[in-house]
């Protein structure tokens, strides 16, 4: 598997994977997610892909250049903030591997690629949010050595 930057030609396949992720969340939290939808429109994806400095997206592709998985990154930095230091963070907005390709270490390779990208580009850390309705994702990130940074809680009224 090769890992490269996402391109506009990958959008149809990325959409399929975005729908898979959304459906996991919709099954776990139908009060918050609409089944069958996805996080981004074509226009939004084109804009994200074009902004290589602020939103790096990496795709893992097979020998036929078929996208097997992706990892969306967002560069975050609090410059001249009153109480936060100016560290540069790479936030993983989304990481997905096609459900038909799981258990082949694709997610691990994408995650490690993102860690290396962050190290090589002067980032302080890599962060992400994981939904409690997705215990498989939580277990994966725990296995990768990620540690809780903060806890986001809710009370449903």
Regions found by a protein language model. Give the residues of each.
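A short beta-loop-alpha structural element at the N-terminal edge
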Residues: 2-16
